[in-house]
């Protein structure tokens, strides 16, 4: 790329930075005063004219300054040399805050609150998708000789407790056998495979004796736990930040809030995140949702090196601090994965 093109990109980068910081359209004189561009105001004016002709910036109807377009933001994001790093103190604070979560729900609630505070946008975290989770542990506890508590723990930290009414009593030996059979069928398997295994076990042990009936009743309850669609659950925080930036949405705030409430668009965008550590930025119309015009979403997946638990990210106006937001989303996602993977 020629030096003139590089210089124009520096002008575009300066316009984006100033507009994000001030919300005010930017003129050539202001750019020369604030940034060390190394050229005259006349040259900057010419560069801005080229950027406008190519669709990277535009002139608001009442201003002599210019603001970035969606195309301009996309060029800026695509050519980010590096993401604004979080300080060691910030990273340590994030890690300590998330590690203090007592269980999966608490960790995710903390993550949403933290991400909304860091970015001053709407933070969204998807509960771990069951299809990618593995059964890490199964506990079978006798509450009474005819009533059991089943506790299923997945590798993503989800704990599900279910009561099984046996209809008949079983002794300690039968309870031990039941625990062993169910554990062998479930532990270490993906939830989709575990549901098949427990159904097969119930089919194989269809017999009139007490244990066969106990396996059947336990399998019925466990299947309810294993096939429940928790991937449709979202946690959101910081929606008040949308109203703080209401002027950025040009009258479309209500439709954006409705889209968030319906969750369909957000779930679709989060479901597209299949690789932990990879951050995706969708700007304006790139969300492919008419009701989300004027917004950008910065999303990623969280999980371990070999397992994606779910998607997460932030939503805000296209006038967004992209370097800072990308860094915050990536850092929080990394620490969620570490915290949940260690449990």
From Swiss-Prot:
Record keywords, A-Z: Repressor, Stress response, Transcription, Transcription regulation
GO molecular function, one term: DNA binding
One Pfam family named in its UniProt record: HrcA
GO process terms (BP): negative regulation of DNA-templated transcription
Highest taxon above the source species: Bacteria
Keyword Transcription regulation: yes
Gene3D superfamilies assigned to the protein according to its UniProt record, in alphabetical order: 3.30.450.40, Heat-inducible transcription repressor hrca homolog, domain 3, Winged helix-like DNA-binding domain superfamily/Winged helix DNA-binding domain
UniProt keyword Cell inner membrane, yes or no: no
Task performed by this protein: Negative regulator of class I heat shock genes (grpE-dnaK-dnaJ and groELS operons). Prevents heat-shock induction of these operons.
Family: Belongs to the HrcA family.
The protein, known as: Heat-inducible transcription repressor HrcA
Gene label: hrcA
